[in-house]
Amino acid sequence: MMIHINNHSIFAFSDTHGRHRDLRVPEKTDILICAGDAVEDNLLGDEYDDFIEWFSSFPAKWKLFVPGNHELSFELGQSEKIEKAMSEKGIQVLQNAVYDCDGVIIGSIDADSSIADENIPTDLDILVTHYPPYGILDDDMGSTEILNFVMKSQPSLHLFGHIHSAKGQKYQFGKTLCINIV
């Protein structure tokens, strides 16, 4: 999905489950974001290698990756290897972190993260998570931690995936436009 904010073009997607090469990424993209589930339960195999090679091939100035629930390697203690492989290809992994893309402040928190309030500033332009906030386009599978963070910080945009049935749907929640980017 193409989004424009602060004179930057952002292409954001999630939940390709190994079918990333089917996406048509616009050439004029400043910020490229994947909100997880790029692979289908693969542990540091060819599927990761192919995704990293594909994702890094775009001329976007910033490439950001937020792990999803299908990135089992992150959950099983392999995140350092993947982050290193991505970093070497110019991809920034955002996991309970913030990144400044030339004045566009983008942050990410985990669905069950209680450290969000401690580490993530509330003046974000964009929040990117894999899971939706509880009660918003979530099929009752959203995160209360994410909901609480969105209520507190009210970023301009909240981009998330995970819920395939809500693909492309938008919901205005206070000052925050929530968009399912599956």
List PLM regions with ranges.
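Binuclear metal-dependent hydrolase catalytic cores centered on His/Asp/Glu-rich metal-binding motifs
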Residues: 89, 102-149
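Short, conserved loop/helix-junction motifs that constitute active-site signature segments
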Residues: 25-27, 55-60, 84-87, 120-122, ...
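Conserved beta-sheet core of the metallophosphoesterase superfamily
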Residues: 61-64, 134-182
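Hydrophobic/aromatic beta-strand patches that form the interior of the parallel beta-sheet core
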Residues: 11, 33, 64, 94, ...
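Active-site-proximal beta-strand elements of phosphoester/diester hydrolases
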Residues: 7-17, 103-112, 126-130, 177-182
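Core catalytic region of metal-dependent phosphoesterases/phosphodiesterases
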Residues: 7, 13-101
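Short acidic-hydrophobic surface loop/beta-edge motif
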Residues: 1-4, 95-103, 169-173
